[in-house]
């Protein structure tokens, strides 16, 4: 099998035209003949490039509003023709060999994401000719290079320059794999979109449509291999979604430190998603996927100091997330005080990075600023299947709370209640969070009975010498019995925020009244397993 194949003729037909003019200019300057279609051909001609319209080459016009452009034997014969084997038949039918195909597909995902997108709009943005050319070229990668990503343009030109206008087989094979991945992802988007509309076509309500497709197709791109997974005997890799805009651990840039481990990524995600809940300067410290300290304040330095005081023992070797730029003073406080695995923030000052550089093992991630959190899906793998649900983006404001006890909360109790309610959303169930003056003072996580989570939160606060009297307590789900309220009262809690909804709500409310506790119902649960 010939390793090198010269590129003498290229067919360019792209929806996303970023970089295509420069790439075409580079190809033309190296003697490559250009074929093109529709808008791509017009753009190249406007830029003064010598380009042949595919319709002129085939002798067959584009038709049906562009639905039929490249579906022609002179196009696909030129792509699929096996060099040295099909030469005679290609010559007989005046089929020119096409050595490179540059294609990206109609923007189906962007179209269906637009508000008010109709079924007709979606249908017209299903590319037919593009995927057909992509698959043809990828199949014949022995002779043809297929380019579906503009990020590959520069590398292709460099390789051609290094190989007298040719591309190596290894490169053509790699490009073919990218092409098959590209068409697989494209078809998956289409199948998912139309699959979600099946209920509507069976006469079900509009609410039934647009939710979950009949068949779920997922495409993720491998970002990195890892030394091991959750445990050292497990192999692992990190895959990310393409074109994610929201600030996340997947899109963050690592500016220093060792490679992230499986557990680092999971814990950093938990910390970052929690800190996003707060508008004020905030710090979240996470250990084993649970917050062990959270605080908001006027500065991230004070927020860090207060979050750390919740549970210094658990903070050792933890993950620290901020929702403001990491400054030098805060970086110095962290490095001087504790061992930390990861620090993640929207940005970091030069002075802060100079300080963290003294501890090269500390991983520092910059995630960028975030706007509104985007809806999406959460997945949980079970043996033989996958649980899928909407992301938990539920929030509750003060105006939505219901006071169900005789006593109303004070302004500070209410602030603390809303604060610890946000934290409880990110604590493993059963979750109990004690908070006072905008900082956590005790967190009980992951217990099988809610009362023990309440007791553990009280123990944590006592161990650190933090005063519970006058604090607020959040519970991620309702109290099935009054014992959790009794435990909180014994610790000194004076305000409770919880979803409500237990068959024993009256008993629980009565317990709160007995202890003089103000109780707020959110009517929203935040289980986290």
UniProtKB/Swiss-Prot annotation:
**Annotated MGS-like domain residues:** 1-148
Name the SMART domains on file.
AICARFT_IMPCHas (SM00798), MGS (SM00851)
> What cellular component terms from Gene Ontology apply here?
cytosol
Short name of any one Pfam family annotated for the protein: MGS
Catalysed conversion reaction: (6R)-10-formyltetrahydrofolate + 5-amino-1-(5-phospho-beta-D-ribosyl)imidazole-4-carboxamide = 5-formamido-1-(5-phospho-D-ribosyl)imidazole-4-carboxamide + (6S)-5,6,7,8-tetrahydrofolate; IMP + H2O = 5-formamido-1-(5-phospho-D-ribosyl)imidazole-4-carboxamide
EC number(s) in its UniProt entry?
A: 2.1.2.3, 3.5.4.10
What keywords sit in the KW lines? Answer: Acetylation, Hydrolase, Multifunctional enzyme, Purine biosynthesis, Transferase
Pathway listed for it is: Purine metabolism; IMP biosynthesis via de novo pathway; 5-formamido-1-(5-phospho-D-ribosyl)imidazole-4-carboxamide from 5-amino-1-(5-phospho-D-ribosyl)imidazole-4-carboxamide (10-formyl THF route): step 1/1; Purine metabolism; IMP biosynthesis via de novo pathway; IMP from 5-formamido-1-(5-phospho-D-ribosyl)imidazole-4-carboxamide: step 1/1
Gene3D superfamilies, per the entry? 3.40.140.20, Methylglyoxal synthase-like domain (3.40.50.1380)
Under InterPro entries, the record lists: AICAR_Tfase_dup_dom_sf, Cytidine_deaminase-like, MGS-like_dom, MGS-like_dom_sf, PurH-like
Highest taxon, organism lineage: Bacteria
Q: Which GO terms describe its biological process?
A: 'de novo' IMP biosynthetic process
Keyword Hydrolase in the entry? The reply is: yes
PTM-bearing positions, type N6-acetyllysine: 287
Could you cite one Gene Ontology molecular function of this protein?
Answer: IMP cyclohydrolase activity
Q: Is Membrane found in the keyword set? A: no
Q: What family is reported?
A: Belongs to the PurH family.
Domain notes per entry: The IMP cyclohydrolase activity resides in the N-terminal region.
In Swiss-Prot or TrEMBL terms, this protein is called: Bifunctional purine biosynthesis protein PurH
Source organism phylogeny: Bacteria, Pseudomonadati, Pseudomonadota, Gammaproteobacteria, Enterobacterales
Gene it is expressed from: purH
